[in-house]
């Protein structure tokens, strides 16, 4: 994630990234000063500003929305939906055994796999005001959807996942097929007292972990 911060009259470009190594998640931050005391957006035309913000809201690898968009743009829509008495649902999607895959495959192959998975979901969730897919971390995605209960989104995701390829053709080096599966946890606003994405996320995460513990390759559909 790239951001800009004003510190003591100096504009800094801040790059933040999470790196998984040895089973731990490390948060890296790099800062570099920019010339002048104005934020880059202040120097742009309206069109340049729009393009810049759009670029900052998308994952550089897969092209789907990123965590920044999820946290600053899409999550705020929940308040609008609940104010209008509209329900919403959230799903967390994870590639199974990602650590083992990363250990077995090189970065280029993993990048192709992530892009493949992202684009499979993007086919069905690419309406920024209502249905979106976001890449939250290396192999974790969030799918947000308005006007769906938990069960309705579960059934939709089951149907989509059932027809989704479970092999990615890796074109790095010798062309070959890389098999993979996914686990999915879903929650809806009607299930949580605090109708916000944090509460939904926590419930989704519990169900995602349960799906993985049950062997993966499934949409969690327990109680």
Predicted regions and their residues:
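Per-ARNT-Sim (PAS) sensory domains and their PAS-associated C-terminal
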Residues: 1-26
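PAS-family sensory domains and close relatives that share small-molecule sensor folds
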Residues: 15-22, 31-35, 147, 186-188
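Signal-transducing coiled-coil linker helices
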Residues: 22-60, 65-79, 129-131
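Short hydrophobic beta-strand segments that form the core of ligand-binding sensory/regulatory domains
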Residues: 25-32, 90, 140, 185
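Catalytic-core segments of nucleotide cyclases and related cyclic-nucleotide turnover enzymes
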Residues: 42-49, 150-158, 172-175, 187-220
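Conserved long alpha-helical elements within nucleotide-processing catalytic cores of c-di-GMP signaling
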Residues: 57, 66-89, 96-123, 134-138, ...
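Conserved beta-strand cores of small sensory beta-sandwich domains that regulate signal transduction
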Residues: 89-93, 134, 185-187, 220
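GGDEF/GGEEF active-site signature
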Residues: 115-189, 208
């Amino acid at each position: 994630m790239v951001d800009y911060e004003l510190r003591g009259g100096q504009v800094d470009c801040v790059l933040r990234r999470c790196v998984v190594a040895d089973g731990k998640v490390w948060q890296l931050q790099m800062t570099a000063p920019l010339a002048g005391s104005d934020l880059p957006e202040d120097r742009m035309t309206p069109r340049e500003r729009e393009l810049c913000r759009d670029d900052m809201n998308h994952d550089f690898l897969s092209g789907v929305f990123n965590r920044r968009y999820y946290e600053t743009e899409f999550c705020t829509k929940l308040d609008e939906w609940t104010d209008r008495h509209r329900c919403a649902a959230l799903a967390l999607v994870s590639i199974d055994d990602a650590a083992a895959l990363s250990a077995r495959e090189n970065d280029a192959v993993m990048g192709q796999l992530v892009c493949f998975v992202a684009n499979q979901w993007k086919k069905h969730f690419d309406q920024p005001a209502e249905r979106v897919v976001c890449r939250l971390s290396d192999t974790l995605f969030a799918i947000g959807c308005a006007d769906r209960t938990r069960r309705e989104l579960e059934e939709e995701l089951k149907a989509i996942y059932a027809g989704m390829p479970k092999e990615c053709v890796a074109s790095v080096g010798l062309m070959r097929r890389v098999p993979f599966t996914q686990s999915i946890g879903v929650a809806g606003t009607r299930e949580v007292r605090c109708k916000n994405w944090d509460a939904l996320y926590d419930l989704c995460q519990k169900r995602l972990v349960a799906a993985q513990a049950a062997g993966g390759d499934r949409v969690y559909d327990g109680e």
